[in-house]
Amino acid sequence: MFDTQREELLWGGRKLVLETGKVARQADGAVVASYGETTVLATVVSMKEPKPGIDFLPLTVNYQERAYAAGRIPGGYFKREGRPSEKETLVSRLIDRPIRPLFVEGWRNDTQVVVTVLSHDLENDPDIVSMVAASAALTLSGVPFMGPIGAARVGYLGGQYKLNPTVQEMEESSLDLVVAGTDAAVLMVESEAKELPEDVMLGAVMFGHKHFQPVIEAIIRLAEKAAKEPRDFQPTDLTEVEKAVLEIGEADLREAYRKTVKQERYAAVDAVKAKVMAALVPEGGEAKFEPEKVKAAFKEVQAKVVRWNILDTGSRIDGRDVRTVRPILSEVGVLPRAHGSALFTRGETQALVVATLGTGDDEQFIDALEGTYKETFLLHYNFPPYSVGETGRMGSPGRREIGHGKLAWRAVHPLLPPAHEFPYTLRVVSEITESNGSSSMATVCGSSLALMDAGVPLRRPVAGIAMGLILEGERYAVLSDILGDEDHLGDMDFKVAGTEEGVTSLQMDIKIAGITEEIMRVALDQAKEGRAHILGEMAKALTAARPELGEHAPRIETMQIPTDKIREVIGTGGKVIREIVEKTGAKIDIQDTGVVKIASSDGKAIKAAYNWIRSIVAEPEAGMIYDGTVVKTMEFGAFVNFFGAKDGLVHISELAPQRVAKVTDVVKEGDKVKVKFLGQDERGKIRLSMKVVDQQTGEDLTEKLKAEREADRNRERQARQSAGE
């Protein structure tokens, strides 16, 4: 019934298995891939006819995690997977980025890649095996895909690179780098690092590229046995159209791209395009070429003109040379009520970044395959359409916004203080108010400034820069701080963030083959130079965290209590903790480890809650005097609340120095009294005394009463002696 084909190899100390022909046989390509006990299903379906009226590749990648893969049932009311999680969105992008450049130019058939996690062993992250499975499914599908690609994760432990470290090993690694590419070239890099040098980062990229070659070979072997016949597709030849466009518009395009203001440049380019269209596709006249071909050729000519200008003259669209960073202005404290804020402007790219400090109540609960965990650092990136002078959809964040936010998160995260030193939940929001390239790196710079403005003790300021590349044969130019046009028309998007000590995040997307290790080294070195310049400009606004938290930020004090006292602090059904919160106004978070976080913008509220909790968990000292309140009277004595939530008994014999016939003759419920803690009886009951305490001054009368009793005994003894004489 099944014509199953299979490839196996030992990779990174674990078995990788690729299998096809058994599951999802109606898809154009389907591969079940397993790594350890993590298993995914990747499918590819591409429509038979091109989608009309579009000039881009209609590729969609969906990565989805199923809770059953880890033996779990989804949370929430419906107990069913819903909208994609952040992890699913990020992995979808991770798969998309290296495969998109490998589709043959001109492919306009709707193509969908779906990767489903079927099993997760909680050791091997599904993202790498998902990329491998998607590559294999595309290679088998018959669509014009110039792969396959391989992918690998690289860690850095004890000064050594580690191929595909486990989830547990990643906790100790100073590097989390994912690299993907073909047998000949690197196409994509995504990473977070703990301030590592550039040569270590580049070494990790090349280490990963070398070690995923066996995976590519396994996919090729599988394709030789199971691949479908290639689709009959011939890319459109635009050679003649491009010649015609160049003849009409090259000079005007070169002039348009000398305009340094973005909106003026766009208007000039649109005018050239209209001139070309009028000449080659005249209204009411005979068209020399199809309109869609002319539009496609014009885009190609645009790219060539920009690239030729840069390679021939070393001068870029806005007049800069290849190494110069646009003018930078950094401002902090721009929003009066925000805990921390910054406005970072670099040329025509601007980010308004706001940092907010919260408490344990504000932590984000994330329901992942590995289980539910809390996230205390959130970074959200918003890209409204007005930032590029357009109208558009507003609403929930798209994939691009989530991806850019995570890139900035990775850049800043390694610099944050540990939770036990700075027990705040942090949320950073970046509002991109203007954009002309490199807005994610503006977010990194603005986030660093906003957090320091809020008083968050970052180890060092962090900055980011976006690099570009123009490659034509043997000639190339690496561009620092690229514009939006240079990003779209160039061959590489290379983002590097870090401090003066090293790199914290590296993201690379390469659109063509031929990017050598040497070119990447030049780009990294040039990025380091640019990053140092940007850090210097940022230092004009702020060089380190402010010594105090923002005026409106909550204050948090932590205390450690014995774990066996947690129940007493919470109380039956939460009664005690609710009372503390209601009466002090402070927020209280108690962790299973006994760490208590008390938060409020009012220092007095924190102190009151702190003392209350301390009184519950602390033990009274024998012989000490405490203020108390009579809470109940009995025939044999009075119960007094005296040490926070502690109650003790003042026996009738301890109420007053003289004999007491009736308890209520001395005290009534609600009376404020002073008591001395005598200790506990054999049953653990607390014993108190009032008679040895001056109820006015709180003075301990024990010695005074003892002296009086001794004097009384002496007088009695003398009286008896006198009577005997």
From Swiss-Prot:
Q: Show the ranges annotated as biased composition (Basic and acidic residues).
A: 701-719
ATP-binding in keyword set: no
Give the main localization category. Answer: cytoplasm
Q: Could you give a GO molecular-function term held by this entry?
A: magnesium ion binding
Residue ranges for the region (Disordered) are 699-725
Coiled coil: which residue ranges? none
Q: Which domain of life is it from?
A: Bacteria
The entry marks the following residues as binding Mg(2+), namely D487, D493
State the protein's name. Polyribonucleotide nucleotidyltransferase
